[in-house]
A protein has these predicted regions:
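Short beta-strand-turn/beta-hairpin segments enriched in glycine/proline and small hydrophobics
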Residues: 1-13, 30-48, 73
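Conserved beta-strand segments that form the floor/walls of ligand-binding pockets within enzyme
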Residues: 7, 18, 32, 55, ...
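Short histidine-centered loop motifs in beta-beta connectors
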Residues: 15-20, 24, 53-56
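A structural signal for short beta-strand/turn segments enriched in small hydrophobics and glycine
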Residues: 22-31, 59-68
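A general secondary-structure boundary signal
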Residues: 50-53, 58, 67-72
Length: 73
């Protein structure tokens, strides 16, 4: 099984995490919503798989390229 690492596209806040560890996701499913400059930016699953690890806490500050999730395919 391969691991896909999902990184942040923006600097802001991990406003809402919408998945839990162990949850199956399909390509394009929403994993998290980040807030940056009063805008909500969704982070989507790049491939189908299972959420192996959530690497950020809800409400935490995030920077561009921070590791957010690991998905096992």
């Amino acid at each position: 099984m391969a691991e896909i690492k999902v990184h942040s596209d923006v600097t802001g806040t991990a406003w809402k995490i919408v998945v839990v560890k162990g949850q199956a996701v399909d390509e394009g499913d929403e994993l998290m919503i980040a807030e940056a400059m009063k805008m909500e930016i969704p982070h989507l699953a790049p491939e189908s798989g299972v959420v192996k690890e959530i690497c950020v806490d809800e409400g935490a500050a995030i920077s561009e390229d921070d590791l957010l999730f690991i998905i096992e395919t």
